Amino acid sequence: AGAAVATASYAPDYAPDVDIRGVVATGVPYFSPAALVALNESRPPDQPDPMLAYNFLAMTLAEQIEPGFLMREYVSDEAWPIVSMVTNACHKEMRARTETAELSYNRAFKQTPSDVLGRVFAQMGFPDMRIAAPIFLGTGARDRDTPQHMQAAFMRDACAAGTVVGAHLYTELDHKQVVPGSTGESLTFVQAVFAGDAIKGNCDASPLG
């Protein structure tokens, strides 16, 4: 979803000859400062948190772009045997190992990497929230990877920039389930944009809050 939005955002400058009619984004990540604050507040630091796998992966990027940053200086001795595998493991494996070890934020880190990660996540943002093509935004209310409030922040900022966004909330679905679970509505959207139909969106009545 993030790649789909980023492609549409970069396209006018990078590939203006590409005719992008619409964007389907189910479970879109959004790393604005406000969204990151809300995300962190929803994750108690003293409770097991499999989402830490994303933090570990982001820290490998920090080592590449932040002079002097060393992951080992932030990760606890207890968590290091797991975290050190991140350079050779995919997210699925890291998440499973993090979950099995019941790592919490407090147990994983001996000093917080929040400032560094904030700068890293800023590099994962979209260059322009004003996107010419309309967006189908599918959100699972049970999504923990890209939670509803994160996607709501994306919608607010995209709508404020003038992007047409049509949001759909699926109350019983999580991050993985929302892709197939939204197919009926997303296919209708795709057919409409290829037919040249006007897409109104629901910026004024978002179901995401």
Per-range role (PLM):
Residues A1-G2, V28-S32, A141-D145, E172-Q177:
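Solvent-exposed loop/turn segments at secondary-structure junctions
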Residues G2-A15:
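Short glycine-enriched nucleophile-adjacent loop
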Residues A15-Y30:
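A conserved short beta-strand
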Residues V18-G22, I131-P134, A161-G166:
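Loop/turn elements at helix/coil->beta-strand transitions in domains of secreted/extracellular proteins
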Residues T26-F126:
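Accessory cap/linker subdomain of secreted extracellular hydrolases
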Residues V37, F109, P113-S114, G118-R119, ...:
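C-terminal catalytic histidine-bearing segment of alpha/beta-hydrolase fold enzymes
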Residues R130, R144-A152, V178:
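Conserved alpha/beta-hydrolase "acid-adjacent" motif
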Residues I131, I135-D143:
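Short beta-strand/loop motif that positions the catalytic acidic residue
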